[in-house]
Amino acid sequence: MSDNVVERGMRYLKNNGVKATLKRIKNGPAPIPPKNNLLGFYNFVVNTEEIPFDKKAYEEAKKSGKITLNWVIPEMSPGSGGHTTIFRFVSNLEKLGFHSKIYLYMSPTFKDNESIRSFLKQHFPLLDERVEVYCDVSQMGFAHGTVATAWTTAYYVRRFNNTISKFYFVQDFEPYFYAHGSEYEFAENTYKMGFRGITAGDWLKDVMRNDYGMTADSFLFSYDDKIYKPKEKTDDKPRVFFYARPVTPRRDFEL
């Protein structure tokens, strides 16, 4: 067993106690309660138990001189566009000398580190191999910055204090994923948690700043010009681009 595994195990023991640690060793990461178990499913929203600052880990990080980032992400499917953008950012940061560690949050599928690492290697080969990947946030330790990447992950980052700075990587206005009800409010509430925003495009940046008082910066939309190339124009016929996505209510497909 590597020293790194031992350190993570001791950290989990320190933060969660003997009983929880033994249960995790036996069962792996805790399963997500079904949605009809209302209190269990939404426990992550009301859970305010803080993960404390580890001064010893901070001092060790100062000695190393390397800046580290924790990225808390939801589970993904092959080819997920949002995750592709995250992994592209993470990989470029790695090349610039910022070391990233990725942690899944509330994953129903990946119960060990090897399974998620193999999945990413197969379906997201663009991810820099130096980036560390873990199946669950229970293994997460100190980092100079910790980044929430979806509204569900923001609730965990809110109580994760083993870090210096907290960021929110916002790629969409997530309340619009839902009808105007509880989940809309849960998602919207994360914009008021005091994180520094990094948004996809200026519209989201302006919404975060003007409507929620968030300090935010944006990045412009881009494409991979090694894959996507403009075709030569052959005529002057007007054409309409129709973006159709029936499975997403906010796209107004029926209209």
What name fits each language-model region?
Residues 46-60, 175-182, 217-237:
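Acidic anion/phosphate-binding donor-loop and adjacent secondary structure
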Residues 134-142, 180-197:
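Membrane-proximal helix-turn-helix segments that form the acceptor-binding/catalytic region
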Residues 85, 91-94, 101-104, 210-218, ...:
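Conserved catalytic-core segment of nucleotide-activated headgroup transferases in glycan assembly
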Residues 147, 160-176:
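Active-site proximal beta-strand in glycosyltransferases
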Residues 1-29:
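Boundary detector for helix-to-coil junctions that initiate low-complexity/charged tails
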Residues 72-74, 200, 242-245:
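Short hydrophobic "strand-cap" motifs at the C-terminus of beta-strands
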Residues 152, 156-157, 177, 193-216:
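A short, active-site helix/loop in glycosyltransferases that binds the activated sugar's phosphate group
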Residues 28-141:
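N-terminal pre-catalytic "stem/leader" segment of glycosyltransferase-like enzymes
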